Amino acid sequence: ARRSLRIYYKGANNQEGGMESDLNYDLFGGLAKDRNGQAITSFSRLLLRNSGQDSYLSGFRDAYMQRVSAGLCVDTMASSAALVFINGEFWGVYNFRERYSPEYVSDHTGANKDTVTVIENDANNLNNPNPDVAFVDGSGVAGYADEFNWLLEFADTHDLSVPKNFAWIESKLDLDSLIDLCAVRVFFNATDWPENNIKLWRDTAPDSADARWHFVLSDTDWGMGMKQTTGPERNLLFILLNYSNGTYTKDCPLTRLLHALRANRTFDEKLIARLWSLPGYLNADRLNEELDQMVAEREPLMGLQADRWPKDNLS
């Protein structure tokens, strides 16, 4: 099967000759950038992604949405097309991707990877009829998921129109990353969210210059009408924000957090302004230019893909 593959450059204890073992190459053509805007050219953690549930359709839907969203306040993963051979046998067309990990955070922000924690929603709770999806440890420093769960409980039980309550949340959570995450996913109608596919990271170092939780853009494969049930007629904004008579359209931690935050007028106005302005950033010219470039990268390879995986449509 053409499955996604995680790649680790380890050496002996991730060291070789006293140096950490990395791939030293500008794999993403300058698209992966550090905090100074310089290309990241050294990697110890990578992902060869098959494009998930989109693997039999475009094969790069998530990579495309992440690429055009780069430069916003929510973290994204760079990508490039790759021909994969395993033991000399052609295995297919994949997407080389960065991977959300402590190493990713260190590369992009300069934080010490040994003090970074990455958490994610607990996918095991998704089938609960009334899901209350707790967050669990993902990678890096363990034991911080409950800290974020407690933040959610605070938002649930405190009036965030009260300045001191909102100020506390604002000191713990990168609200700009949350706003841009919501705006991007609504723009692309990227469902299987907000109840799922949520990841955050933070630097736990006591002397960290920024110890807030930061949202990342993760797994948008269902976006742009991939599934018939997620076409343009599906109003993700309504699902995300609607709350009436004590009932959420979709009852999950993120919708409850947004409802609580919108009690603060400044946050609410900022969220609405971003939802309104994002189409100017993601305009048709920008979207078409990036799409044409990514299609041109992959189109010559798709005949090889179809020959290798004839039952997988054109992926």
Region roles according to the model:
Residues 1, 15-19, 54, 71, ...:
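Middle-to-C-terminal accessory/interaction subdomains
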